[in-house]
A protein has these predicted regions:
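Terminal peptide-recognition signature
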Residues: 10, 37, 94, 161, ...
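Extended hydrophobic/aromatic segments used for targeting, binding, or gating
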Residues: 239, 248-258
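Glycine/small-residue-rich hydrophobic helix-like segments
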Residues: 172-219, 225-227, 231-233
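Short Gly/aromatic-enriched secondary-structure transition segments
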Residues: 32-36, 40
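A short acidic, helix-capping loop that chelates divalent metal ions and anchors anionic groups
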Residues: 45-50, 185-188
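Thiolate-centered catalytic microenvironments shared by cysteine-dependent enzyme domains
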Residues: 47-50, 54-150, 204, 219-244
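Flexible, polar/low-complexity N-terminal or interdomain linker segments that lie immediately upstream
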Residues: 1-33, 108-172, 181, 255-256
């Protein structure tokens, strides 16, 4: 499953993994980046005109990763400078297009975790292009409007809104619980909170490993981080509503206010 790794873990394996920086290109070039990292800015793999939701489409994804020198069998570590939410979106996109989830890793603490203790570089990374081949995944966490609608009445399922409380109060899916994705992140370290704190926060929201979890936000960016965290914690029945509230409201799905 997709997991979260420390900067120490990455430092020990830097020559064996493909590191992907999803920050803006000017940050990659001007501020510096991890040694050997390739730049794939966030806006390059998000498109309202590609696939379902904000997925870029198979051809665009193939071209993007091939040009960045990423191979389909690479171990990939992604990072950003926004507590991991943009990097998580990259990893979930890779997962949805068939990359082996056991080879997808989020850098805990984002760029800051590495930059605090280790050297970065502004030198361009030499990239040797690949032919990235998408493999249809044996199973997918993707769920559509109809599946989410059916889940509203399922007592074994918890529907999780990962937006902030103000957004949740303005309107959310019936029966959904609010779990702001930032609640799982330590503001000081920018990484995940300790395991016992995570378990307590999740349990308080009714999110436990024995229940099916359906995630949504507005455009599937924030749920990407929550998906990666739950995967890292060993949750094995987590559904990903790519269309999220944008599609839900466009199709006149029921919304309630608090």
């Amino acid at each position: 499953m997709v997991d979260v790794v420390s900067s120490d873990w990455l430092a020990d394996r830097l020559g064996d993994v493909r590191v992907v920086d999803v920050r803006d290109g000017w940050e990659f070039d001007g501020i510096g980046h991890l040694p050997s990292a390739v730049s794939i800015p966030f806006d390059r793999f998000r498109s309202a005109d590609g696939d379902v939701g904000m997925l870029p489409g198979r051809d665009a994804w193939t071209d993007l990763l091939s040009g960045a020198g990423v191979a389909a069998d690479d171990d990939v570590v992604a990072y950003d400078d926004t507590h991991g939410v943009f990097a998580a979106r990259f990893l979930v996109t890779a997962l949805l297009y068939g990359h082996d989830p056991d080879k997808l890793h989020l850098l805990d603490g984002d760029f800051s975790a590495w930059n605090r203790e280790r050297e970065t570089t502004t030198e361009a990374t030499e990239v040797e292009g690949t032919v990235y081949e998408i493999t249809e995944p044996a199973e997918t966490p993707l769920v559509d409007f109809e599946a989410v609608e059916a889940a509203l009445d399922d007592s074994e399922t918890v529907i999780v809104d990962t937006r902030d409380p103000a957004e949740y109060e303005e309107g959310h899916l019936p029966g959904a619980v609010n779990l702001d994705w930032r609640e799982l992140v330590d503001d000081e370290t920018r990484g995940l909170k300790p395991r016992d704190e995570l378990d307590s926060i999740l349990e308080a929201a009714g999110v436990t490993p024995d229940r099916r979890v359906v995630l949504y936000c507005n455009t599937a960016r924030r749920i990407s981080h929550t998906y990666v965290v739950l995967s890292h914690l060993g949750y094995d029945d987590v559904a990903f509503y790519e269309g999220s509230l944008t599609e839900w409201e466009a199709r006149d799905g029921a919304v309630v206010e608090d």
